[in-house]
UniProtKB/Swiss-Prot annotation:
The lineage of its organism: Bacteria, Pseudomonadati, Pseudomonadota, Alphaproteobacteria, Hyphomicrobiales. Its EC number is 6.3.2.8. Gene3D superfamilies: Mur ligase, C-terminal domain, Mur-like, catalytic domain, NAD(P)-binding Rossmann-like Domain. This is UDP-N-acetylmuramate--L-alanine ligase. Cell wall formation. It comes from Rhodopseudomonas palustris (strain BisB18).
């Protein structure tokens, strides 16, 4: 049985969240009656309202009146008045992943998981399948520049979704094709141990049906170890590793883009194939690896080499993934969502490869618990930055932790050999700090999952005002 067409209204608590908004948009486009609430106004709320979805600002019990089902994310606390009202009225309450799973049952599905790179890889798979005239339905964790949204309803038989592992609910997703980009210690507030994280990813891959396949990056040692543990499922490995089934070769940075080729090896059939002259209009080895995963899926689903080559060259990127927000006197300002040490290191390496000037990193640490649990890693991931500007921790609803703050982070960076680390007293002071540090040819990279994106977009204008 599939989601009945007559069900509704479907009420989303926290509808403006990036994960929730995409599901709500696709359900609305399918013809379901969708409504919701969010704590504040925002771009996603405005976009959904423009589609005719009724959205309340603020959470109140009466908002769920008349709903057939209430959808919540893990960000919604148990004492939320709408959640309490739904349960008091015996309205079914489902998690975000459960509703996503209902949509996935309508199509064949590619699900992209991993600690880092999910959103970009999801966008790349979508772009390639779009170019191959698959007309896929897409639900992503970031705004795809080509669509201007994080979701679209396609008429084709395939769906491409980002699988969020943060609360373990990605195990509910019925994927036919699974991608695993990497597995690092993250979301330990839910999983408790890194062993549990790895076991969840193993289960995610083993949930793929026997007629499907998984695409896994063996450049990552944890993923390589997982490949050896998975039984009775078809695995396609990728990476620069010589043992990979789909191998990234001759990666050459070229300013803001990357050139490379990809070689395919079918061990069972004893055949080999190569796609040469690939160009991705994004810098960084991590993005080339993400593209290799997408190419592996596209090739397996029958796309031609030329289609893959053209689609990749025209890839428009994802908002908040190495996004240029402007320039000032030859200085390039970049906005990036990177908030984990592995992501930060990859983004700064891409910036280093893109310029002969200095790389100035502006970081807004996201969550006290993340900074605490990965403090050593945070203190060693800025090696490609000439200057590190450190803002106050963005709490994301967390209470402060003694000894885990901006100033201790600054001391930690200096203790690990960084010679120029600047504590940012307030966001309004960022322009003057950059004005004094940056020169033509430099890159200023704003990093974090909080409101630092607003600073990144305001910075070019603020710098011009100081001239």
């Amino acid at each position: 049985m599939r989601l009945p067409r007559e069900i509704g209204p479907i009420h989303f608590v926290g509808i403006g969240g990036i994960g929730m908004s995409g599901i709500a948009e696709v359900l609305c486009n399918l013809g379901y009656t969708v409504q919701g609430s969010d704590a504040s106004e925002g771009a996603n709320v405005s976009r959904l309202r423009d589609k005719g979805i009724a959205i309340h600002v603020g959470h109140q019990a009466e908002n769920v009146a008349g709903a057939d089902v209430v959808v919540v994310s893990t960000a919604i606390k148990r004492d939320n008045p709408e959640l309490l009202a739904a349960r008091a009225q015996r309205i079914p309450v489902v998690r975000r992943a459960e509703m996503l799973a209902e949509l996935m049952r309508l199509k064949s599905c590619v699900a992209i998981a991993g600690t880092h790179g999910k959103t970009t890889t999801t966008s790349m798979v979508a772009a390639l399948l779009d170019a191959g005239e698959f007309d896929p339905t897409v639900i992503n964790g970031g705004i795809i520049n080509a669509y201007g949204t994080n979701a679209r309803l396609g008429a084709g038989e395939w769906m491409v979704v980002e699988a969020d592992e943060s609360d373990g609910t990605f195990l509910k997703l019925p994927a036919d094709v699974a991608i695993v980009t990497n597995v690092d210690p993250e979301h330990l507030d839910h999983f408790k141990t890194f062993d549990a994280v790895q076991e969840a990813f193993r289960d995610f891959v083993e949930n793929v049906p026997f007629y499907g396949f998984a695409v896994m990056c063996i450049d990552h040692p944890v993923v390589q170890a997982l490949v050896g543990k998975i039984e009775d499922r078809r695995i396609i490995t990728y990476g620069e590793n010589p043992q990979a089934d789909v191998r990234l070769l001759d990666l050459t940075p070229n300013g803001g883009s990357s050139a490379f080729r990809v070689a395919f090896r079918d061990r069972k059939a004893g055949t080999a194939h190569e796609i040469a002259d690939l160009v991705l209009p994004m810098p960084g080895r991590h993005n080339a690896l993400n593209a290799t995963a997408a190419i592996a899926v596209a090739h397996e689903l029958g796309l031609s080499d030329d289609t893959i080559r053209k689609a990749l060259a025209g890839f428009g990127g994802v908002r908040r993934r190495f996004t240029k927000t402007g320039e000032w006197n030859g200085v390039t300002i970049i906005d990036d969502y990177g908030h984990h040490p592995v992501e930060i290191a990859a983004v700064l390496k891409a910036a280093r490869e893109s310029t002969k000037g200095k790389v100035i990193a502006v970081v807004q640490p996201h969550r006290f618990t993340r900074l605490q649990s990965l403090f050593e890693e945070f203190c060693t991931c800025f090696n490609d930055a000439d200057v590190v500007v450190v803002a106050e921790v963005y709490p994301a609803g967390e209470a402060p932790i003694e000894g885990v703050d901006r100033d201790h982070f600054v001391l930690g960076l200096r203790a690990h050999g960084h010679r120029e680390v600047i504590p940012l007293q307030e966001s309004a002071a960022l322009a003057s700090v950059v004005y004094g540090a940056a020169h033509s040819g430099d890159y200023v990279v704003c990093l974090g999952a909080g409101n630092i994106t607003q600073w990144a977009y305001a910075l070019p204008g603020e710098l011009k005002a100081l001239d």
